[in-house]
Regions:
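Non-transmembrane, aqueous-exposed alpha-helical and coiled segments at domain scale
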Residues: 1-410
Length: 410
């Protein structure tokens, strides 16, 4: 059974934690898109791990993890990450595999990424990791794939600098390469997690273009990255926070006003640790955007949701969420494609009573305070999708499941 896990907002929703939580019952975990621009923070057994390329299931010693076909991989960043894991007691040898169709990020791509963004009229706010350039080279048919490394004839097409860089990693990368379609066929009777990067609202086609990532962060990307067809995806789990965040430029219709709502902004940012794992940049924060969340559910055929960071609201008297946009006097519940409309959108807010109780002590859904359950049930009713998993803290155990995505029940 294959369960895809995607971000249902603008990234940083807590996908890594949810994948880590579910990975215990999976045979394998496949990261299907993105590169070292992504960042997952996982807290397990009192230790904090920051992952950028390696799938979140790596912390389970018996699990196999795969870097899928839709990824763009910086070999230097990958092996630095693997060495860091090893230094922290995580034995990864023989458990990490790379799709032979994955593309490689070269050092010169990083500077090219920064240069391109600086020349834009409206800069995107790239991480400068070379990801956009790698995907651009891929679409122009000029990229280098893992499969190319074993062919000496290919080397004549590369620059001297590229050859020198790749020579340092070729043998190790080739030893880890696999045919993803064959691997997934062998795993057809097993439970497999397909792990996304960034979020649905950053997808190149269905996100807030042009302020998007270059890869496929939508559910469809799971098929491409894992080397399987759409019918092979059994469940799609969308992860979202109890509020909205975004890194870099682009519209965030429910963003807190840093002047009139500075206290609320600082509280959410600091209590929620809303600083980028990859860049360290403070994330922009705002109310939960139900218009965007419902759109993400529909465009990705999300079958269930996982709610994270619910505990960040523990001390608030009142909680608000956006249920519609006011765009030049017109009220709409539909998420527009136009960036111009999104930048004009003012949130129409619905108020909810706060629960004023620490949620970390809650062991299951029934023990949540009534006001917390009401907040969740309103989200379910608005989006038309059930919340199957709730996270009330950073540790693995601060998570409880109402319905297991792997049981196949709708």
């Amino acid at each position: 059974m294959n369960v895809a896990v995607i971000g249902a907002q603008w990234g940083d929703e807590g996908k890594g934690k949810i994948v880590d939580y579910l990975a215990g019952e999976a045979a394998a975990i496949v990261r299907f898109a993105g590169g070292a621009n992504a960042g997952h923070t996982i807290v397990a057994n009192g230790k904090q791990y920051a992952l950028h390329l390696v799938p979140s299931g790596i912390l389970y010693p018996e699990k196999k993890v795969y870097l899928g076909s839709g990824m763009v991989i910086d070999p230097e960043a990958l092996f630095n990450e693997l060495e860091s894991l090893k230094a922290n007691g995580v034995q990864w040898e023989g458990r990490v595999f790379i799709s032979e169709r994955a593309h490689i990020v070269l050092p010169r791509y990083r500077e090219e990424d920064k240069k391109r963004d600086s020349e834009r009229v409206h800069p995107i706010g790239t991480t400068g990791r070379g990801i956009g350039c790698a995907y651009s080279m891929k679409s122009e048919r000029d990229g280098i794939r893992i499969a190319d490394l074993e062919w000496q004839e290919k080397r004549t097409e590369w620059t001297k600098e590229d050859r020198a860089f790749l020579d340092r990693y070729s043998d190790r990368l080739c030893a880890m390469k696999v045919n993803m379609t064959c691997e997934m066929y062998r795993l057809k009777n097993e439970k497999v997690l397909l792990e996304g990067a960034q979020g649905a609202m950053l997808d190149l086609d269905s996100g807030t273009y042009p302020y998007v990532s270059s890869g496929m962060s939508c559910a469809a990307g799971a098929c491409v990255g894992a080397g399987i067809g759409p019918r092979a995806i059994d469940r799609i789990l969308g992860v979202f926070k109890a509020y909205s965040t975004r890194v870099g430029n682009g519209p965030l219709p429910t963003e807190f006003d840093e002047q009139s709502q500075s206290e609320l902004y600082r509280y959410v940012r600091d209590t929620g640790r809303e600083y980028g794992v990859t860049t360290g940049r403070a994330r922009r924060c705002g109310y939960l955007d139900l218009v965007a969340l419902r759109y993400a559910c529909r465009v990705n055929s999300i079958t269930e949701l996982a709610l994270t960071h619910l505990d960040i609201y523990d001390t608030l008297d009142t909680i608000e969420a956006c249920t519609a946009y006011n765009i030049d006097g017109t009220i709409t519940e539909d998420f527009p494609a136009s960036i111009e409309k999104l930048e004009k959108a003012k949130p129409v807010l619905q108020s909810f009573a706060g629960w004023k109780t620490p949620l970390k002590a809650c062991q299951n859904y029934k023990t949540l305070p009534p006001h917390a359950r009401s907040y969740i049930e309103y989200i379910e009713q608005y989006c038309g999708v059930k919340v199957s998993i709730v996270s009330v803290g950073y540790e693995r155990q601060d998570t409880f499941m109402r319905n297991d995505p792997f049981d196949g029940k709708r």
